[in-house]
UniProtKB/Swiss-Prot annotation:
Present with 8350 molecules/cell in log phase SD medium. SUPFAM superfamilies: P-loop containing nucleoside triphosphate hydrolases. The keyword DNA repair does not apply. Broad-specificity nucleoside monophosphate (NMP) kinase that catalyzes the reversible transfer of the terminal phosphate group between nucleoside triphosphates and monophosphates. Also has ATPase activity. Involved in the late cytoplasmic maturation steps of the 40S ribosomal particles, specifically 18S rRNA maturation. Required for cleavage of the 20S pre-rRNA at site D in the cytoplasm. While NMP activity is not required for ribosome maturation, ATPase activity is. Associates transiently with small ribosomal subunit protein uS11. ATP hydrolysis breaks the interaction with uS11. Signal peptide: none annotated. Its EC number is 2.7.4.3. Changing G19S: Sensitive to hydrogen peroxide. ATP binds at G17, G19, K20, S21, S22, R114. It is found in: Cytoplasm; Nucleus. This is Adenylate kinase isoenzyme 6 homolog FAP7. Interacts with small ribosomal subunit protein uS11B/RPS14B. Not a structural component of 43S pre-ribosomes, but transiently interacts with them by binding to uS11/RPS14. Keywords: ATP-binding, Cytoplasm, Kinase, Nucleotide-binding, Nucleus, Phosphoprotein, Ribosome biogenesis, rRNA processing, Transferase. It comes from Saccharomyces cerevisiae (strain ATCC 204508 / S288c). Residues 113-123 are annotated as: LID.
Amino acid sequence: MEARRYGPNIIVTGTPGCGKSSTCEFLKNKLKDYKYYNISDFAKDNDCFEGYDEGRKSHIVDEDKLLDMLEPLLRQGNSIVDWHVNDVFPERLIDLVVVLRCDNSNLYSRLHARGYHDSKIEENLDAEIMGVVKQDAVESYEPHIVVELQSDTKEDMVSNVSRIVAWEKMWLEQHPDGVTNEYQGPRSDDEDDEDSE
């Protein structure tokens, strides 16, 4: 397995219908050497399901199997990950978490156009109002790598992609020797004392 990666891994997340896939389409056209993983498609293509939720009318992803298959790919870096769940991926492999937000009237229209049933629309609207995806991101990753961007219009998406591309350029400049994929563990008090000397 790769011990170091020389390009960042970026998660684009948010409530279903907030524009993740559209944003990722724009982004992968700008970051041409990046691999794009739509996790819903990846899970289906690699049979990473452990059941079906009749109430939600959706498959239940086997997160362990998903991670076993995806981690070697993320260790290579230069990945764009598109999924509404963001707390599955190891913190050591993620460099930026983009949480897309959407006005509820736009979100309702998008989900209704997709044919979501009313209870699923309501569940997603509630999640958006309460900022569930952002909260999960901040609890799962260092807060400084989590950024929240509005995603109501095509112009918003284009602007968001420009910001992500600028961040990627800065990341590459700051990490010319890449970053480790290995867990470094928490810093000890001894290390902090040595650093201050």
